[in-house]
Amino acid sequence: RCGKSYLLFTLFKNYLIKQGVKEDHIIGVNLENRLNKSLRAPDALLQYIDSRLSSDGQYYVMLDEVQMVSEFEDVLNSFLSISNVDVFVTGSNAKFLSKDVITEFRGRGDEIHVRPLTFREVADFRDDYSQDMIREYMLYGGLPQVVLENDVNKKVSYLEQQMEHTYLRDIKERYEVRQDSDLSELVDIMASCVGGLTN
């Protein structure tokens, strides 16, 4: 929700092309896209990428939401031995926590955190700097889709949806939480105490 896919498939791809990389040497797969469902099987993904590689020049493989591939660690490890392939991946849920990735690929990759927009970035983007902008940022945060949305109801709806379908679901899956109501109540209590003294 912070723009990882846009950063990878648009900005980085355009950068590579400007550097002289041929488009057929950039292999991108959005694994969240239903059209690519068959590529979520590790062997199918390996075969698809391998069929597009040759020995001429450097290749750049971009896999978005790689945690949707079962045994994705094995898939990524398969490309480590190929000298003319660089692999870039994104992931965004409990199955793809950075500490797990660091453990699995220690010394064989770099990690880049993509965070929501800072207030300065929002202020630079918009030309209506005011106290209202500060209040709005403090209330709704800096997720790009929220910043771009003008309708308050749509902002709230989007944030509620993210909380329920992204964060809470990931916590439930990762830690096998069975009492949904207890988790929701805990989150409500913690959210109401932000910035306040707790005992």
Report the location of each language-model feature:
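Conserved P-loop NTPase "ATPase switch" module shared by AAA+ and STAND
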Residues: S54-F72
